[in-house]
Amino acid sequence: MAEAGGGNASAPQKAPDKVVSGRVTDTAGAPLVGVNILIQGTATGVVSGSDGGFSIRMPEGRDNLIFSHIGYVSQTLPSAQTRLVRLVQDEQEIENVVVTGIFTRKKESYTGSATTITSGQLARVSNRNVFESLKNIEPSLYIMDNTLMGSDPNTLPDMQLRGITTFPSESTGVSIKGNYQNRPNQPLFILDGFETTAEKVMDMDMTRIESITILKDAAAKALYGSKAANGVIVIETKRLAGNQELVTYTGSIEVSMPDLTSYNLCNAWEKLEAERIEGVYTSANPQTQVDLTKRYNALKAQVLGGLDTYWLAKPLRTGVGHKHTLSVELGDSRKLRAMIDFSYNNVAGVMKGSERTVLSGDVNVSYRKKSFLFRNILSVSNTRSDNSPWGDFGDYARMNPYWSAVDPQTGQIARWAYDEVANPMYDATLGTLDRETYTSVTDNFYAEWQATEALKLTARLGIAVKRSDADEFYPAKHSKFATSAYESTSMQLRKGSYQLDNGKSSDISGEIYANYAKNWGRHYLYVNAGGRIAENTYSAYQHYAEGFPNSQTADITFARQYAQDKKPVGISSITREISFLGTASYSYDDRYNVDLTFRESASSLYGADNRWSSAWSAGVAWNLHNEPFLRDQDVLKQFKIRASAGLTGNQNYDTNEVLATYLYYTGATYHGQTGAYLSKMPNPALKWEQRMDYNVGADITIHRATIAFDYYNSVTENMLTDVAIPTSTGFDTVKDNLGKVRNRGIEAKLSYTLWQGKQGFFNLFGSIAYNKNIIINLSESLKAYNEKMMAQAQDKSNSTPVLIYQDGMPMNAIWAVPSLGIDPTTGQEIYVRKDGTLTYEYDAQDQVVAGISDPKYRGNFGFAAEYKGFGLSATCTFLGGGQRYNTTLVNKVENVDIHYNVDRRVLYGRWQTPGQNAMFKKLGSYTDENGKQHDEKTRATTRFVQDNNELTFSSLSLYYEFNPRLISKIRLKRLKLAFYMNNIATLSSIRIERGTTYPFARSMSFQLTGTF
């Protein structure tokens, strides 16, 4: 008998852990690498390997596995069902990741400030172009209305992210059409991991876009080092996802209607009355008075007879454009997949003959072999921009309504509207040509090797080539040549002009990165290291010719000669760069997160003494919602606090600023030899412009409400500035690094889901961005620039504020002389001197900062709803806190030439008699009763600086997506109908003409999408 407790006693044995193995793929059957597989209720897990396979030991009592991967819907499955796991990509999941263009990170562990916009969000706002959608979604990206060019489809918008960062660059003296390079405040654009241009983004087919990520603070954008100071916009196109052969067609018709609500011009009777009041038909000379009375009576009879030409409508139309996209998806989904896209987009502007036509094709091929992935995207596009032959819209706004647009005898468009006043409509009948075209070919190759479960190597090679041409032809009969300067016989032969521009550019870049990602227990480590090398070349040439007697000879080879005193000119540049990048991210228990980035870059853009520059960032984040004391509750779903600091650079500048560039003397020789001279003073010590960013923020989700908040403080230093130097050097200025500018701001977003169900949702949203810009350290070297601006302001012919820079003031400050209004006794304006005394004499030295042209805050609000396939969304945008100088009141009321049409406010509010309280003084240019000519133009005064607050109903969309079961009977997988309206209405606190060269437009479009 064995003793109690003896070694032969039978004890319960622990059951051995079972091993669960399986494979994870996407819906197309392609293996997913790096999927996190976690045993539910524990911190134990593994990561799927290069073929999507995994193997994990399951302890006793545990049976469920959680599968999660960036951009895919997480799944929890019992171990018995994990032999083959398919993860589904979800648009909502895309919002929870950050695509940087170099790697993709979970938003929960990301420390940077970034906004991700999905294709669905873009489509709910507009189907016109990317910038139209971004303008209505993200207020921190300020896409400015162009008050001159309005809704011209061929004008690229200006934009800035989190304020102005640099002084505007002075012109090189050669203005090449179609050259949109070196806009100093423009963000960097990344398309599928490669740099691209804003013009390319504007012409993109929006149906190709999967997501857009805007990188704002240093922790987010320091990846791009010396190019990231202005922010980075990362665009990802749609990846191949299906395992079937699919054909998708999207077609739309867009209707654009002119918006002339900002114009307040006189009709025929009002204009005639304004002329009478201003004394146009009054003279002290009796004989002259008789002639003036006859003229007035004749015009009055015509007006009473019904002559009232609405000139604004003459060059306009309701533009009808159309867009078509065909996408074909084919191939073996497990190894070789391909997607081919064809797109045609015709944008018809509201001015007759104004169009932008884009024809593009893309081939996306993906091949996977075991642990290797190869992807190549070839894009070819051709864009043709036709500017309206009807000329400048402002010319029509000047025409008197009592002038006839057509010859009353023949009914044809008259060459002269009145006496020697040219009819702008006539120019459109002559064969005028103003066209730009460009063709671009881009090939982006991507290779990936999943060496181990944790180590991945990636490589990119991108090649882009662009060729652009521009033709501008004006026949001899054009109104440009209907002046006394062309009356002589020799000048007659010079009538007609042609400007021909040719440009080409090429970009080649290569990148290689290694990244290591490892999960162990509660720890997660991600390390990425690599480098980039790139070269960009650009050249453009411009030719002027004249002498085209025949309007049908719209070709420069028919010119009589080169334009007088002109010769072919051009610009060229070449930029080379190399950089090395290292990033590291660490996360503990999904609670504490740290991101570190360092990039060392060298560029030929800057001086030989300062080729290299460093960019860095450090970011931390704390996920409070994952703390034990907040984990077991359902109300607070997310509460992340983050902070970052870092340094980035800007190089949106002319490449020849630091090079010793020489030009040849073409007009003389010395002993048969041609001499050369230095065209500009080089500066080998020129440094990188740098921006130091500090950012704190929070991301909070409480029940159905999502809140995001950011506060930032950015200081830009080493700003490139034209510095005055002694003329004994042979130059007036040289580029140098001087001055600092600070931008401080707050951004806040709120989204609230009122209702969410299986059949739909109803969501409210709103956001606001506030920015304050100020110059904090301005060098004395800019004193010469300010003196030049002050001299311009003192010029009696100048009526608009000039740009003056001063410490403690915003960069876009509006400078004007203080005004107390119009003296009721004399009708003259009363100015306030710097010493506080009053005067009638204008002195530009008395100017003060009267306002800021940039709005202090911008934002949007609206809703998005869907129910049983029906969707409705609306967005309003607003801005305020800034000021504008009302040029309409100056140019169309006070400084107006009364012989052309004027603003209706000329009829009232103008001082006429002593004792009258008036808003406006008497006419600036006039002839008194004694026949003496007066020209007392209104200058820049605070009287015309007005608060600028706007509310715009910017977007409305309605769509219906058919039930898949219903349309499957006709072999359709998807069918969607949509209707859009954009720029519907604008309410403004300031009455000013908008779109003075090209009018603004309201648009609506109808879209159909079908997948077979």
Regions found by a protein language model. Give the residues of each.
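Short, acidic, small-residue-rich periplasmic hinge/interaction motif at the N-terminus
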Residues: 2-40, 64-73, 80-123, 131
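Extracytoplasmic gating/loop element in the C-terminal half of outer-membrane beta-barrel translocons
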Residues: 480-482, 562, 603, 879-976, ...
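Outer-membrane beta-barrel transmembrane strand signature
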Residues: 190, 297-343, 410-450, 564-583, ...
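Extracellular/periplasmic, surface-exposed regions of secreted and cell-surface proteins
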Residues: 358, 364-382, 420-474, 490-800, ...
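Periplasmic N-terminal accessory/gating domains of Gram-negative outer-membrane beta-barrel systems
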Residues: 6-11, 73, 110-179, 189-222, ...
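Acidic/polar loop-and-plug regions of large Gram-negative outer-membrane beta-barrel proteins
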Residues: 303, 386-442, 476, 480-499, ...
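Conserved small-residue
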Residues: 248-302, 542, 736, 753-853
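Residues embedded in well-ordered regular secondary structure
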Residues: 125, 137-160, 167-183, 187, ...
